[in-house]
């Protein structure tokens, strides 16, 4: 390892501390990315940072978004950037790319139709676990992929996915799967205030607000102290 590129967003978890310790142990160069900069990796590659935010309130909004260009081929790596960040990037950059790694594991917090239409991808790679508790990839995202006419590839179905390119064409070591158009994720609530088909646990407030726009109280099954930053018994309120 020679370089470690980070968003600069500080975490307090053991995992984050362990990562920083590993970087130090390996003697790698720690580098905090900045919006618009070009990362130097190889003279034949152009890697531009389209988004990063060390001061983001939501960890996902701190995501580093990269556009990797090799000759005539472009690949967009979006991290967990949500639809608001997608809109910001559309106003500043040409995001058109042959390949995109769908944001946030195929969550409906990312991969808006407007964004995918601007990207004009030939292939969309969805990275998510089989039978995950979040319901990824969400039906809205599958609909959007189908609408723009891209082929979808799934790590849950194919495992590790490798893209090989000479800079003009590319091959993928997996078979595309049908991102069938389906009904939008249901958001009706039962008597306990729990949205049907919603995950019980959410990794961040952006995801939670897709189902619970006003957040949840401490009595709700989806309440988590880490989302209640002001300790008022209500998580992810606006």
Question: Whereabouts are the PLM-identified features?
Answer:
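Non-globular, low-confidence helical/coil segments that flank catalytic cores
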Residues: 1-192
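Mature, structured domains enriched in cysteine- and short glycine motifs
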Residues: 185-238
């Amino acid at each position: 390892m020679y370089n470690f590129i980070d968003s600069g967003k500080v975490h307090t978890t053991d995992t984050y501390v362990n990562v920083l310790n590993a970087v130090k142990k390996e003697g790698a160069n720690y580098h905090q990315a900045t919006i618009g900069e070009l990362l130097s990796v190889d003279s034949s590659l152009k890697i531009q940072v389209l988004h990063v935010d060390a001061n983001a309130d939501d960890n996902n909004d701190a995501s580093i978004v990269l556009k990797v260009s090799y000759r005539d081929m472009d690949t967009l790596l979006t991290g967990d950037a949500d639809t608001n960040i997608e809109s910001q990037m559309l106003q500043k950059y040409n995001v058109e790319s042959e390949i995109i790694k769908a944001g946030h594991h195929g969550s409906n917090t990312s991969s808006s139709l407007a964004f995918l239409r601007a990207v004009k991808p030939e292939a969309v790679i969805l990275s998510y676990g089989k039978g995950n508790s979040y319901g990824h990839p969400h039906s809205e995202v599958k609909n959007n992929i189908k609408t723009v006419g891209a082929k979808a590839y799934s790590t849950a179905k194919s495992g590790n996915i490798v893209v090989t390119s000479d800079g003009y064409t590319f091959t993928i070591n997996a078979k595309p799967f049908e991102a069938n158009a389906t009904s939008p994720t249901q958001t009706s609530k039962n008597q306990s205030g729990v949205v049907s088909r919603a995950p019980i646990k959410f990794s961040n407030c952006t995801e939670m607000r897709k189902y619970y726009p006003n957040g949840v109280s401490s009595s709700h099954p989806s309440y988590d102290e880490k989302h209640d930053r002001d300790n008022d018994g209500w998580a992810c309120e606006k």
